[in-house]
Amino acid sequence: KIMESLTEVKYKIGTTGTLQETKTHKLQLEGMFGPAYFVTTSADLMAEGTLAQLEIKALVLAYCDEERKLVSKMNYQEEMDWIVRNERRNMFINNLVKDLNGNTLVLFQFVEKHGRPLFDLLNKLDRKVFFVFGGTDALDREKVREIVEKEKDSIIVASFGTFSTGINIKRLHNVVFASPSKSRIRNLQSIGRGLRKSEDKDSVTLYDIADDL
């Protein structure tokens, strides 16, 4: 709507690191800005040292046959609810984060049934733990960012919606995908939170938790 109103603007420049591969989305952007021009890639920026080196660790959680049979009868939403409410799974995430060195970002999708229980678990650790979601005031989010930039071992438990874009924290050493997500764009944007470099950081590790059901 903003772009449609800028009828007298001579130059319009739009930038993104996650151009969707759908034809409709690309045509919409080209209609507003003109042809897309790919300047570089994340891999090239890592190779030249502009971005932190990314290591991805896929952690596949196994379940017993009884649990698999139970989940096989569920629809997608019921399966998601079962996964994020699973106490053993949340305890695994808690133990994983507890053993990580550096500042860690734990990303979740559902606030009440997943984010808050994870925060309650992690908040028992002897570390600074912050909880950020859609209801968190913008000024409070900025305070969290400023605090974490000065910390070495803090934990941010945040929703994908609030921390997948627009947050610039250089001193993030670990990113944990606590919730399953089918959104390629959101996953890429979330990974981008950890690719900033700092004086004492040149790499970031992504822990992608998968469920073998």
Where do the model's predicted regions map?
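Post-DEXD/H (motif II) to motif III coupling segment of the RecA-like Helicase ATP-binding lobe
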Residues: 1-57
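N-terminal helicase ATP-binding lobe
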Residues: 1-15, 19-24, 122-128, 147-150, ...
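Short, charged, surface-exposed secondary-structure boundary motifs
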Residues: 22-26, 49, 136-145, 184-192
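Short, basic/glycine-rich phosphate-binding loops at helix/coil junctions
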Residues: 52-78, 122, 126
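Conserved interdomain hinge at the start of the Helicase C-terminal
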Residues: 71-109, 113-124
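Conserved helicase ATPase core of P-loop NTP-dependent helicases/translocases
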Residues: 116-117, 127-164
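A short beta-strand element within the Helicase C-terminal
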Residues: 158, 167-180, 189, 205-208
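Conserved segment of the helicase C-terminal RecA-like domain
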Residues: 193-213
